[in-house]
Structures are given as C-alpha cells and as structure tokens.
C-alpha cells in the first residue's frame, strides 16, 4: 500500500486533456466551417490559406523523420521555428494593414473646416442678399408713392383742365419724379452681388464633390470591413496550424507533458485574440459610422444649400425681369400725358406681382440662412456625440 502510495506520489502529473486545452469539438468544427466558407468567398484569405497550408505541410514533412526516430535535428527545429515566425509575421502584416486610427483623420477635419468656412461664406451672401432686398423694397416704396402722386394729380384734373396744352411733366410732374427715381434706382442686384453669388455657388458645388468623394471612400471601407473577419480567420487558422505543428514536435521528442503545454499555450490566443479582434472591429465600425454620420450631415447640408441657392437665383431673375419691365413702363410714360396714364396702369398691374416676388425672395433668403445654421448645428452635434 505504502509502496503504491510512494510510487504514486512520484508519478508525473497527468497531462491536461486536449478538451480542456482546445476549444470544444463542436465549436472547433463550427469555426473551421466558418473559416472554409470565408476562404471560398475571400480571394485574399484564400491566398493566405494556401500559403499557410504549404508552410504547415513543409514543417510537418520535415518533422516526419524525427517522429520515426523519436528525435529532432537542429535543421528540423529551424524549419519549424521559421514556419511559425512566418505565420506570425503574416498575421501582424494583416493586422497592421487594417488597424488605423480612422476617427482621428486630418483629412476629415480639413473637410469639416472647409464645410464650416463655405457655410459662413453662404451666410455672408445671405446678408448681402438682405441688403439687395432692402433696395428692392425701397423701389417698391417709390412706385407706391408714384401711384399715390398720380391719383392726387388725377384728382386735380379739373384744375389742370385749363392747361390742356401743358406738357405732361407739368400735369404729372410729381408722378414722373417718383417714377424717374425708381428708374434711377435700377437693378438692386449689383455686379458685386452676382460675383459673390457665383463664388459661393461654386464653393458649395466643390464642397459637395469633395463630400461625395469622401463618402465613396468611406463606403468602400465599410464594404471592406470583412477584412476584420479575415483577420479573425487568419488568427484562427494560424493558431490551428501552430497547435498541429507543436503536437508533431511533441510527438517527435516523446514528451506528452510538453505536448499538452504547447497545445494549451497555442490555444490561448483563440479566445483572447478573438475578443481583441471583436473589440478592434467594434472600434473600426464605430469610427466609420462616426465619419459617415459627419460626412452625411455635411453632404445633406451642402445639398440643401445648393438647392436654396438655385431657388434664390430663379427668384432673383424673376425680380430683375419685373423691375426691367416696369422701367420700360416708366420710359414709355415719359413720352406724353396719355403715355403717363397708360404706363401707370401697366405699373399697377405689375406691382402686385413684383411685390410678391420680392416677398418670396425674402422668404427664400431666410430659409437658406436657417437651413445653413441648422446644418451647421447638426454637423457639430455629430462630431460632439461621437466618442474621440
């Protein structure tokens, strides 16, 4: 009994079972199945797998002789070590290719700065437009005064009856004075204003193009997110191959405890690296999502600003045409007395439309300004909300 106990106390500890060192059979089979499917759908992973199989086969073939004689040559160990180092280097290369600090992108923040600068220029343009609208409303006031003067002078028609031969400037002098002031005021939209409009419009178009290009690149990155799954698959395959090779090494030197230790050590990365990859993947996805949210917000804001500017340009053209038409009426009214009456009647017909166009333009200018400020706020919220 004692001898039995004594001999048992010096018996080497039982090697850890392969089940405790390796993932469960079902889990391993599922992982292998997933890896095989990934290889079929991913050319790069398929290339890596081919290289991995070739290196693993070469290492095992080198070890085969050592297994037969239960010993290993230095050359065999060098081959195995080189194979494992090659596989690890391949994993590092893939990870380094994929791991980039996406959110802290100088290009993105340059784009954000450009966006805020262009939006400020557009707001400045809206301020310039307000000044033009004030001049247009002043022109409206001149026309209202001219019509009032005409009514007053019509009321005094009896007093002027004895002056039928008088020049129209004598009978409708005050009316013509106001009409000439309107004519002298001319187009409220100056050449400088149109130059500013063109500059702002081109800037917004350029901004939209930059944002579209950036979004296209981000979309490609999102589609390429399967690279992270490739990393996970590569780590799994490399670990699997390492376990296989280490098992052959252990068999070759006839050391079961070493085999167990190597198997356990090689299997550890399957769980820990998997969690790390998941964490890395989540950070990558969050960073891409944050960039896309910011770029999309800027893209929507820029698109709306361009549409607002298009509407403003259409309304400006309409106001200019109506002013030009009424100036023609004023020039016609300057001919004679009857021309004054006809010109004033035409102006009365056109004035209401002119007033409505100026009002519409003012509302569109306010809308453009509100849209830009709202878009700027949304972009800032997207940036603040995203974790740095």
From Swiss-Prot:
Is Membrane tagged as a keyword?
A: yes
Q: What are its GO cellular component terms?
A: membrane
Topology with regard to the membrane? Multi-pass membrane protein
Which Pfam families does UniProt cross-reference here?
DUF677
Residues covered by region (Disordered): 1-25
The membrane spanning regions, by residue number, are: 234-254, 257-277
**Name of the protein this chain belongs to:** UPF0496 protein 1
Which organism encodes this protein? Oryza sativa subsp. indica (Rice)
């Amino acid at each position: 009994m004692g001898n039995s106990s004594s001999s048992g106390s010096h018996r080497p500890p039982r090697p850890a079972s392969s089940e405790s060192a390796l993932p469960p059979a079902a889990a391993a089979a599922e992982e292998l199945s997933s890896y095989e499917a990934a290889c079929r759908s991913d050319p790069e992973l398929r290339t890596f797998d081919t290289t991995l199989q070739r290196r693993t086969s070469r290492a095992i073939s080198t070890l085969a002789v050592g297994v037969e004689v239960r010993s290993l040559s230095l050359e065999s160990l060098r081959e195995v070590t080189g194979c494992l180092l090659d596989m690890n280097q391949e994993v590092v290369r893939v990870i380094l290719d994929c791991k980039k600090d996406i959110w802290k992108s100088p290009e993105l923040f340059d784009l954000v700065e450009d966006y805020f600068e262009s939006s400020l220029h557009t707001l400045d343009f809206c301020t310039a437009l307000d000044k033009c609208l004030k001049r247009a409303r002043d022109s409206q006031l001149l026309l209202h005064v001219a019509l009032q003067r005409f009514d007053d002078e019509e009321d005094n028609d009896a007093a002027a009856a004895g002056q039928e031969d008088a020049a129209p400037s004598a009978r409708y002098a005050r009316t013509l004075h106001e009409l000439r002031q309107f004519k002298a005021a001319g187009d409220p939209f100056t050449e400088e204003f149109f130059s500013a409009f063109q500059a702002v419009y081109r800037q917004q178009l350029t901004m939209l193009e930059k944002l579209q290009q950036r979004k296209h690149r981000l979309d490609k990155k999102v589609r390429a997110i399967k690279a992270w799954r490739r990393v996970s698959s590569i780590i799994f395959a490399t670990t699997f191959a390492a376990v296989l090779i280490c098992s052959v090494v252990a068999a070759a030197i006839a050391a079961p405890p070493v085999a167990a230790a190597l198997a356990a050590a090689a299997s550890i990365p399957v769980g820990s690296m998997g969690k790390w990859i998941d964490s890395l993947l989540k950070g990558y996805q969050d960073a891409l999502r944050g960039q896309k949210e910011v770029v999309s917000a800027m893209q929507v804001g820029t698109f709306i600003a361009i549409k607002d500017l298009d509407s403003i340009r259409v309304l400006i053209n309409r106001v200019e045409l109506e002013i030009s038409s009424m100036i023609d009426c004023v020039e016609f009214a300057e001919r004679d007395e009857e021309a004054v009456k006809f010109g004033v009647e035409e102006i009365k017909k056109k004035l209401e439309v002119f007033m409505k166009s100026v009002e519409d333009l003012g509302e569109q200018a306010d809308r453009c300004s509100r849209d830009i400020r709202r878009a700027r706020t949304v972009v800032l919220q997207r940036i603040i909300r995203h974790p740095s």
